[in-house]
Amino acid sequence: MLVEKRSTEIREIVEAAERLLAESAAPRKAARDVKKACEPPHSSCAARNGLGVLARRVACESHESATPLVRVRKFTLRLGAFTSLEDVSFDIAKGKVTALCGPRGCGIAAMLDALGCTLPGARTVDMGGLIELCGHDAYRTLGAERAREKVARVFFGGSFELQSVRNAIAFSIRQRGVHDDAAIAAEINRVLRSLDAERRLGDHLDCAVSSLPALERCLASIARALAKRPLALLVSDPATGLDQVDSFTMSQALQSVARKTECAVVVATSDPRFARICADEGVVFVQGRTVEAGPLPKLNSASADYWTQAFFEGRIV
């Protein structure tokens, strides 16, 4: 009897405890239900996961935008017995104009050849170090031919100047496999807009390139290279033969290309004045070596390096 009585008491205690728990949980459950009903759809778990994915994507895009398009590390170039470049390192960002600058004979022409994968035959060339394009070794992984598809070198003069401006640009467009006349016309307009040259070249599309003034001939050469839709545009001494006004116009055209196409524009120049007005970033070469790299305004006015100061002050040419 005593055991049965004890069991009954325990059962009654358990039932009372369960009732108390249920009564205390009901308000909390009701509050959760009301909160859930009032939440907008985007606060759901799936939406939060979606926001997490978006945040990761933005972070990745930010990282990609900060990653240089071209990385040069400890690059050395020997042409036969002559060492043209030695232990060269710098970065090139997309969407900016980078000036490779220095006195004549400093190695910037050879560096532009190396970046454009247009070096002479392999028997005479000995390379060391790394040129990386889009995260891949331009010579060992991509190969020179594939790398040249991503990089456009601007060549001034030549037989193409016998063609009309329209045909010169259209030739590069057709090389990409575009043959529809309407598509070619639209692409020509895109190229001219990228250069801010709708008026300077757009009014002379049917004129021979050779018949144009010096500035317009240079712009036509750049437009022809730009029609290939390159990731990097390489230009050597674009202000040669131009007066101050035309040099400024050329600098603005190069800035426009970088800004509107996100292309990396690389300019090789021994003219400190043109480097100052055209470039966002600069790399200073002396005797085949890089002595300093960084934002052009800093190199121009706040550098502590002797050779950089001497170049921008015009003391070495």
Regions found by a protein language model. Name each.
Residues 126-127, 135-152, 175, 299-303:
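ABC ATPase NBD coupling module
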Residues 268-270:
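H-loop/switch region of ABC-family ATPase nucleotide-binding domains
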Residues 193, 298-317:
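C-terminal boundary and immediately downstream tail of ABC-type ATPase nucleotide-binding domains
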